[in-house]
């Protein structure tokens, strides 16, 4: 994951984290965080909320993924229907807004609404698309599956990190510092597979109520 972050920084796709750190468990069984810029090491036992299974690791959210807001686009550049001239999906805080002639993201990402009533809204987007300023594109480092990130954020309850103002906004700078338990890749895939199998059953049950 650290190698992937270094590559993205070098390619200027993400900004260098001035407070980059690593979290590890010492010989005394306590958790420590080492800040790479200064070499400072501090015990973080009081910040660790619970024990995790063997093979899992505690990290901050910023160690797992980057979170980048999209770019502003004029309403006149967004069209209701897809066409040869406007083939790319334009994605806002609550999913599809329309279609446009350019894209600023390519891949498979979790998308988070970052302002107003749509603050904390989650979607998945694939391929080439345009993310507006109301959407945060979440890009997992390394080989972390985007669906694992999507379901993780769903469980995280993002609304708790919204600013308490007349126009709520997602405080990304706070979210990236949250401690998270990160399982090994095979376990990430098993978690996603299990959720995907259970969701249709949950929906069927909800419809029957």
Descriptions of predicted regions:
Residues 14-24, 74-82, 163-166:
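Short coil/turn segments at secondary-structure boundaries
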Residues 92-154, 163-176:
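A short beta-sheet element
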Residues 52, 140, 180-182:
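Hydrophobic residues in beta-strands and at strand termini
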Residues 42-75, 80-93, 185-193, 198-209:
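Non-catalytic DNA-recognition/assembly elements of restriction-modification systems
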Residues 1-57, 63, 207-209:
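Accessory (non-catalytic) regions of SAM-dependent nucleic-acid methyltransferases
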Residues 149-158, 162-166, 172-209:
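S-adenosyl-L-methionine
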């Amino acid at each position: 994951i650290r190698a992937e972050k270094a590559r993205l920084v070098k390619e200027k796709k993400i900004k260098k984290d001035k407070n980059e750190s690593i979290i590890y468990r010492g010989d005394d069984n306590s958790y420590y965080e080492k800040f790479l810029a200064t070499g400072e090491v501090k015990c973080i036992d009081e910040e660790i909320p619970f024990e995790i299974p063997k093979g899992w690791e505690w990290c901050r959210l910023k160690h797992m993924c980057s979170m980048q807001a999209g770019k502003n686009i004029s309403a006149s550049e967004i069209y209701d229907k897809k066409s040869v001239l406007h083939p790319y999906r334009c994605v806002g805080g609550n999913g599809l807004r329309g279609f446009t002639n350019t894209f600023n993201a390519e891949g498979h990402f979790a998308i988070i609404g970052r302002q107003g009533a749509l603050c904390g809204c989650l979607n998945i987007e694939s391929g080439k698309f345009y993310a507006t300023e109301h959407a945060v594109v979440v890009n997992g480092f390394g080989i972390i599956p985007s669906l694992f990130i999507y379901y993780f954020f769903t469980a995280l309850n993002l609304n708790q990190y919204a600013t308490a103002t007349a126009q709520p906004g997602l405080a990304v700078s706070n979210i990236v510092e949250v401690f998270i338990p990160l399982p090994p890749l095979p376990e990430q895939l098993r978690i996603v597979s299990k959720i995907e199998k259970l969701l249709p059953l949950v929906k069927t049950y909800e419809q029957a109520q």
